[in-house]
């Protein structure tokens, strides 16, 4: 086993427009092939669309969407004596946020629509209203954890 210590995670700098770490994180998630300015434009266009459609502060809607899509528990595979059990585990705050952002981006990519900005805006609005694929994924994760509650004592 490695003798090196655990490396500290670098803090995510807030983005320049909204001064928000969450916006910066979703920009990084959307980015492909190092094209960060394109990813930023997609996110800012989506947030502008949200503000025009709802009349509310786009950042608040975005934060509510992330909060609604964040899972509280997940299952992890654990091998015990030749059998693999799905053990329910609590999700740490940082991982929960990361999973929520990952799901929001993943399902906005698979959505029908013309531009990525509009698809992202629709997914965020759905998540803020407790519907959409990201919310369904969170509910499915919670159901899996509930179904495997009997194996909770295998937690590590």
Curated annotation (Swiss-Prot):
Does this entry carry the keyword Transmembrane? Answer: no
State any GO BP term from the record: translation
Instruction: List, in alphabetical order, the Gene Ontology terms for molecular function in this entry.
Output: rRNA binding; structural constituent of ribosome; tRNA binding
Q: What keyword terms does UniProt attach to this protein?
A: Ribonucleoprotein, Ribosomal protein, RNA-binding, rRNA-binding, tRNA-binding
Does the keyword section mention rRNA-binding? Answer: yes
Locate the coiled-coil region(s) and give their ranges: none
Q: Which Gene Ontology cellular component terms are annotated? A: small ribosomal subunit
Tell me which SUPFAM superfamilies the record gives: Ribosomal protein S7
Query: Which family is this sequence assigned to?
Result: Belongs to the universal ribosomal protein uS7 family.
Q: Which HAMAP family match?
A: Ribosomal_uS7_B
Q: How does it assemble?
A: Part of the 30S ribosomal subunit. Contacts proteins S9 and S11.
Q: What does this protein do?
A: One of the primary rRNA binding proteins, it binds directly to 16S rRNA where it nucleates assembly of the head domain of the 30S subunit. Is located at the subunit interface close to the decoding center, probably blocks exit of the E-site tRNA.
Protein name as annotated: Small ribosomal subunit protein uS7
**Gene encoding this chain?**
rpsG
């Amino acid at each position: 086993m490695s003798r090196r210590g655990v490396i500290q995670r670098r803090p995510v700098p807030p983005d320049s427009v909204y001064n928000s770490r969450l916006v910066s994180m979703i920009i990084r998630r959307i980015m492909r092939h190092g094209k960060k300015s394109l990813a930023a434009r997609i996110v800012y266009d989506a947030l502008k669309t949200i503000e025009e459609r709802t009349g509310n502060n786009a950042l608040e809607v975005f934060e509510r969407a992330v909060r609604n899509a964040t899972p509280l528990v997940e299952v992890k595979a654990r091998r015990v004596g030749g059998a693999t059990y799905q053990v329910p585990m609590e999700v740490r705050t940082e991982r929960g946020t990361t999973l929520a952002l990952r799901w929001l981006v993943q399902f906005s990519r698979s959505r029908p629509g013309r531009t990525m900005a509009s698809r992202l805006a629709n997914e965020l609005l759905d998540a803020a209203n407790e519907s959409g694929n990201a919310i369904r994924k969170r509910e499915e994760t919670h159901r899996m954890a509930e179904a495997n509650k009997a194996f909770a004592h295998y937690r590590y």
